[in-house]
Amino acid sequence: MCGILAVLGCSDDSQAKRVRVLELSRRLKHRGPDWSGLHQHGDNFLAHQRLAIVDPASGDQPLFNEDQSIIVTVNGEIFNHEELRKQLPNHKFRTGCDCDVIAHLYEEHGENFVDMLDGIFSFVLLDTRDNSFLVARDAIGVTSLYIGYGLDGSVWIASELKGLNDDCEHFELFPPGHLYSSKEKEFRRWYNPPWFSEAIPSAPYDPLALRQAFEKAIIKRLMTDVPFGVLLSGGLDSSLVASVTARYLADTKAAKQWGSKLHSFCVGLEGAPDLKAAREVADYIGTVHHEFQYTIQDGIDAIEDVIYHVETYDVTTIRAGTPMFLMSRKIKSLGVKMVLSGEGSDEIFAGYLYFHKAPNKEELHQETCSKIKALHKYDCLRANKSTYAWGLEARVPFLDKKFIDVAMGIDPENKMIKRDEGRIEKWVLRKAFDDEENPYLPKHILYRQKEQFSDGVGYGWIDGLKDHAAKHVTDKMMLNASNIYPFNTPNTKEAYYYRMIFERFFPQNSARLSVPGGASIACSTEKAIEWDAAWSNNLDPSGRAALGVHDSAYDDQLNKSVSKGVEPEKIIPKMEVSPLGVAILS
């Protein structure tokens, strides 16, 4: 994928404007260090910074149809491009790039082709025949995209805020699953799956169908002409991604080019839970494993860069984005340009620990729907921008459209957590891959308790961030926080510290409005806090704040509960010992 910037209808076709567009496009160069392109048609400019993954030799952008009347700049991967090419027998393609089909599909189907694309994408298409344009973003918002408006009536599109924040009067997130047509001058939702209405589904749980849908999502994402690997934290989601990838890699084109030995990557503080678990999974599935350790000071030193690149002041995004940012730099230094990652599973399968308190299947399902709809503001944004800061692409198979349809069609009663039956969080996913004859993972990894990435890299990480923020934000500053930051007022010193840095880079009102807010417990929505009255006094996005659920909850909070006579519950899933002998590293 890449970085895109478009300025449309700016009433200025001067050389000075072209130079300015080039200057702004270079702010996105980290997203695409392999090639730069700019096409101007009158007062319309389409710029592109390319990260070459498919057809690196000839897939430079912008892309065109045969007579160059249709111009496209794309940040994306179209996994079904070969199938789509077969549906366009009368068209001649200039490149082997997967995104080359977009201009030709538009010629055949007009604006109604977007749902035909199976992939992740953000694109701007300019039709020079009538000077109209079309902008679209993928279903869930895996790719990042913003839209802005100039005082001269121009429309601006950019992969990141920094491409347009200084030149637009107003800008905002481009909504995922939507397209914007200059002909209609409005947004239109193109992605309308059954689950989007939040009606309660009733399909029976079919573990084999779920497993097969996920395997297909993985296999299609092995489309690459460059070296790649998997992010492996040792948690359920990344471990399943790694296991399935390792199992099917040998039969792919990628294996013929780069070898059938999968590379895996993990990051953490010394002694972190994730490092140990990831090492064990890597040994079990046979990957070439790369382990990166960082110190709390390394992470603190990177905070400003992380906030600049990820473009948020959301606490949990920065906590998790920092180690991912550091790891991505190491991965890119090894010559790897694409990784598979495990984002999205917790939202789909009610995996966050606060779901233990869901009162019924209706509220659980509605919460999962809300979480998926908001992914583009949180985990998708983090995974996209913290990797692209170093020219590394992250693909997320759990957010495959067809897989989501299967997973979100399951009667949510099956996702309810029932400890007395051994059903812990994400039970339906764990059960689907609990294969006694041909195991995907060691049993205790398959049933490892949910650990948020910012916790799993080492419990000292969050504590270190809080201590550092306390040195820079005084009690007096906190008393005045609502006057300084009336929107999304920071309620902790850590949040205040991140907000100060963000405002320095992005001082515009539109920028601060682009970041989500609201109270949260262990990454919940504000609505879910009502599930447990005690949570309102313990608002922290860490999974360790899920008192009575997390096995390593904050010690001081546990002590308070015990002093009140409340015994924290431990989750002990019912499971059988794996028939395979697995060495547990100490």
UniProtKB/Swiss-Prot annotation:
Location of the active site: C2 (for gatase activity)
Domain Glutamine amidotransferase type-2 intervals: 2-185
InterPro entries referenced in this protein's UniProt entry, alphabetically: Asn_synth_AEB, Asn_synthase, Asn_Synthetase, AsnB_N, GATase_2_dom, Ntn_hydrolases_N, Rossmann-like_a/b/a_fold
SUPFAM superfamilies tied to this protein: Adenine nucleotide alpha hydrolases-like, N-terminal nucleophile aminohydrolases (Ntn hydrolases)
Pfam family, one: GATase_7
Keyword field contains ATP-binding: yes
GO molecular function, one term: ATP binding
UniProt KW Amino-acid biosynthesis keyword: yes
Residues annotated as signal peptide: none
Protein name: Asparagine synthetase [glutamine-hydrolyzing] 2
Gene giving rise to this polypeptide: AS2
